[in-house]
Amino acid sequence: TYIDTLFEKEIPKTQEAFARFHTYYQIIEIMISTVFEDKFKKFVEQLNNSVDSLFDQRDELGNMIQEKQRVKWLFSEYVSISQQEKNILDECCRKLLQENGKKINTEMGDNLYSVRCLLVHSMYMLNEYSHKLLDEVNKAFLDVIMDMLLTFKIT
């Protein structure tokens, strides 16, 4: 699978922190696409069994297409990660977000998504200290990814 290829070929040679983060985040992208498929199938089943119109359920459908929401569902419903590893990754993300004047959220998944957005939209503005913080994020992120790969299941 593509994930096997990432671990066998890409991750060992990816040394730059930015590239490493995006390689790890690709695993999240793969998982949230599966989350979307699962949620959408359940949504269609619910529509078939419901007297409510699609118009009445448009908000739920809108939530499904938001990446941030799928990341939340992934961490809350589809994987089991030790609280300690969640806390470590969350703290690393918080430090990086704070250093760059970004909003800090209450949930680890939200903070991880915010780091992703920071890197995609503002990487060119990161200072040297932020790059060191990103290395810390990556170390914690890899531990979380390993747990995710071992525990991912469709609900």
What do these predicted ranges mean?
Residues 1-155:
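Amphipathic, oligomerization/interface secondary-structure segments
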